[in-house]
Amino acid sequence: MFYPEHFDVIVIGGGHAGTEAAMAAARMGRQTLLLTHNIDTLGQMSCNPAIGGIGKGHLVKEIDAMGGLMATAIDHAGIQFRTLNASKGPAVRATRAQADRVLYRQAIRTTLENQPNLMIFQQPVEDLIVENDQVTGAVTRMGLKFRAKAVVLTVGTFLDGKIHIGLENYSGGRAGDPPSVSLSHRLRELPLRVGRLKTGTPPRIDARTIDFSQLAPQLGDNPMPVFSFLGNVDQHPEQMPCHITHTNEQTHEIIRNNLERSPMYAGVIEGIGPRYCPSIEDKVMRFADRNSHQIFLEPEGLTSNEIYPNGISTSLPFDVQMQIVNSMKGMENAKIIRPGYAIEYDFFDPRDLKQTLESKFINGLFFAGQINGTTGYEEAAAQGLLAGLNAARYAFDQEGWFPRRDQAYIGVLVDDLCTLGTKEPYRMFTSRAEYRLMLREDNADLRLTEIGRELGMVDDNRWAQFSEKVELVEKERQRLRDIWVHPKADNLEEINQLLKTPLSKEANGEDLLRRPEMTYEILKKIPRFAPGIDDSRPQAAEQVEIQVKYEGYINRQQEEIEKQLRNESAALPIDIDYKQVSGLSNEVIAKLNDHKPTSIGQASRISGVTPAAISILLVWLKKQGLLRRSAS
């Protein structure tokens, strides 16, 4: 039977991608349906209990800047907050938080259940309704049919998922949850390229059986950072330490002696695992010269005795897992309460997607999260937000939107995926971005909140606070530019004492702040430059200092971006047959026909497509009258 109500957007899956997608569409005023196999696992952290990190924290800030929910949820659920790379420049500083799994899940569910325009329904989805290359709905296991103008697939590791512990395996979406087998088979019938990937998780340990007195604690930062631009430290719950232990030669010998029982090394697992989060057996074999690896013992929550040993993800048999755990310092008597495992699952080649994350072959069908070959909560959430907002726009016949590489790490993420594809689980790093200085955590709101407002995703409260911050920063910078000091003026001794070299020429407040030894906090304590921005507005104060100190570098990078954009925005029709373009080599023709890039910029980043080929393509497009601007 058909459900009586028609929806604008259906989101399938309630993980990190699905929850952001559903929220984005609903915030934009679309009637949205979130279909999940279990309402109790909305926002579930399937692997490590943490949000953020290098590159990942940047994504969370961008999600927040556009009105997403991940940053707010972790501010209410984080039990240890740290700023990584704090001693380095602002471009690579990143926020990370350990999470209480229960509090995080509660924060996500509460937000979803109180969001207007959003209905949640518990039923596994087994089929899509596709008519004339257009998705029109979804069918659940009980045969209930839901109709919608757009559908977002965010099914994580559930597509034909297979869990491995040693040489034993069974079907599963994650431990304790069934896989989506029927939906996987249905998707394989569509004209989409499909592959298999693998990820893994470590055994969970009973904290009461660990001797923490032997281990070094790792404490959070004080003062604590916050994730959301609207957040504050008062939202954080009680804080907890992590602890550090290490593998040793005995650990490594146990692993080497049991490799034939590893499904990876026995050839049972076909999927490729994440390069930057390898299993412990992979680390021991790939880094044979290392006699020790650092393991972080991370608490799973304030009311839980479970410990997540970050660094020993494994699919070895349970008896070997016990030996590995007990071989480490402080863990001699530790008990495992959940075994580690590997999971294989289907993913779909993201090169078959537009950069809006809509399928190139099925109109109105959007993909987000691990189904696109990524790994990580943050990468999934970022895609979910983008897919959700574009599904919402599609439902109202509006043109899609996506950020450029110079606008956001979300833009880097989708461009990498849709242009290059991936053969292994993709994770974000700051090193993937060409314009890191422009894509900082601290300015994510300055880059994206105005866009989010135009798209209908940013509410009045966020917009008011953002506008006030922008005005405060602009006024303070103007104030500093207007205050001048002369080297021969009286009472300069106080200023010169703060400088490595005394003033030799007239300078204003911004000139002084550009000096390496000067900070905004010091500057505003000088009577002439007091009072400055109040201590209750640290984001605005930080923005003044960064904008002033890095202005020259930022301006140079902006010039580079403007040069790049001249060709970036030339859009390419998807249905071009590149054999028609005379002058292109057979290799270039094959790669362009395979990738089907949607812009000249995207085409230029395909391996083997030369600058000469791009020039030929631009000339051909102009002759054919096909040269036009892209949606971004």
UniProtKB/Swiss-Prot annotation:
Record has tRNA processing as a keyword: yes
Protein residues bound to NAD(+): 273-287
GO biological-process terms attached to the record: tRNA methylation; tRNA wobble uridine modification
Gene3D superfamilies linked to this entry: FAD/NAD(P)-binding domain, GidA associated domain, C-terminal subdomain, tRNA uridine 5-carboxymethylaminomethyl modification enzyme MnmG/GidA
InterPro entries (UniProt xref): FAD/NAD-bd_sf, GIDA_C_N, MnmG, MnmG-rel, MnmG-rel_CS, MnmG_C, MnmG_C_subdom, MnmG_C_subdom_sf
UniProt keyword Flavoprotein present: yes
Record keywords, A-Z: Cytoplasm, FAD, Flavoprotein, NAD, tRNA processing
Protein family membership: Belongs to the MnmG family.
First and last residue of the signal peptide: none
PANTHER family in alphabetical order: GLUCOSE INHIBITED DIVISION PROTEIN A (PTHR11806), PROTEIN MTO1 HOMOLOG, MITOCHONDRIAL (PTHR11806:SF0)
Localization of this protein: Cytoplasm
Protein task: NAD-binding protein involved in the addition of a carboxymethylaminomethyl (cmnm) group at the wobble position (U34) of certain tRNAs, forming tRNA-cmnm(5)s(2)U34.
NCBIfam families membership: mnmG_gidA
Protein name in UniProt: tRNA uridine 5-carboxymethylaminomethyl modification enzyme MnmG
The organism's place on the tree of life at top rank: Bacteria
Cofactors that this protein relies on: FAD
Self-association and partners: Homodimer. Heterotetramer of two MnmE and two MnmG subunits.
Residues reported in the UniProt entry to bind FAD: 13-18, 125, 180, 370
Single Gene Ontology MF annotation: flavin adenine dinucleotide binding
A cellular component term, taken from the record's GO annotations: cytosol
